[in-house]
Amino acid sequence: MNGLYEMLSGFWRDDLKASRALVAEHGDRAPILMSVLFQKAIQKPRAERNAMAIFSQVYADAAALGEDAIGTDFSFVRFTHSKRLRMFTDVVDRATHGLFGKQLFDPVSMQQVFHTLAFRRAGAKTFQVAPGLGRELLDTDVRGLSTTDLHAPYEAFRIWVPPELGLRVWVAGTGWHPLAEVYAVRDGGSTRSGWRFLFHGLSKNNLAFDNAITFHGLYDEEDKPLEELAAEQQRLMAQHAEGYANDPEQTAVTNLRWAINVILYLTCTNVEREHRYLDPRAAKLVAKTNAASGKTRGKMKAKLRLLDRRQVIYLGGSVASRRS
């Protein structure tokens, strides 16, 4: 890897033709190549144009890499402007604590990158499920339903899982992890359509990409019921993961059923939702800023810029109060 890095050291001038030639020459080493390219992309301001072109070139000339790594067409991340590139590098940089490397391109980590990118591309909607509603959805049956019944309002979104539910995921080496969040992505491919789910367990060692995740795909093949598709995923996990092979609780089925029920809840006509700021101080300051005027309003806006103004959509608040 050091040799390749040195070879690329003078690579970020304006020679796009040389860049593409290098990609073609080292197509079999594309994971390492991309690791180096994006590391250098955030180090030099003029690198963005080349990085965008190179990223597109890699996945145009070596599409099999994306297909093999994540089982789907990767073309949606061929960026067309620098904002998307910065978004990508920001995601990867924070997710890996600034460490780029081959681990980013192993199948598990590619799934994590894929779902994160799809989530951000669809507007980064996060749903926080109230514990009471979460328990009701955990106990709700999905018999008779198929993937054609799943019509969420967004192409991709994230669900924060109430810890009170006790949901979990299993990974080799570290065993069971509490399930923290679920990424759901609608997969409308040319040959099949369905949903992809990534279940992210809490890290036991606080390291990024510690593989505390599992992923599943539910596709509309022969209009099979969702319960049957979930059971197939459980059997598949049992073949490759020891924890699921000795799992009387059918954890994969339980997790998928719960995520499916959240999607179904989002399509109800009487969905109970409330937009909440992650930082409670932001909500108060936004209200005060809207009511202020003149210099006072300007000062409050300056304070507001220092706070985290991201929001989550809280589902089922009154259900939680009835259950508490």
Regions found by a protein language model. Give the residues of each.
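C-terminal, beta-strand-rich globular interaction domains
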Residues: 320-324
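Intrinsically disordered, low-complexity regulatory segments
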Residues: 1-317
